[in-house]
Amino acid sequence: MNHGSIHGPGYTGGDGIEAHTSLAGGKKLSDDFHIYAAEWEPDEVRFYLDNQLYATQSRASLKPAQKWAFDHPFFLILNVAVGGDWPGNPDDSTVFPQAMLVDYVRVYAHPGE
């Protein structure tokens, strides 16, 4: 399962704005390389997996106590999470060690920005 999350003031940790998707046919993400993308606009972020849009998160979808993370400096995290409240602690079925292989990361900007 692939998760795309936005964390910011008022929605950190387990309270992030999140969307997720899986591959068709029960295929595992770990079986091959994939293209993950996030397109950022001032008022929304679109998440893609292998060029397929799977979620759009917008400033308008925030709860009143939340602030839009992208009105402030921000950063990208790529990780394999283990333990804690999410996704949960490993058990006897958990295979270690694990690795996340990243072939490349690209950042683009609209012309003139």
Which residue stretches match the model-derived regions?
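GH16 jelly-roll
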Residues: M1-E113
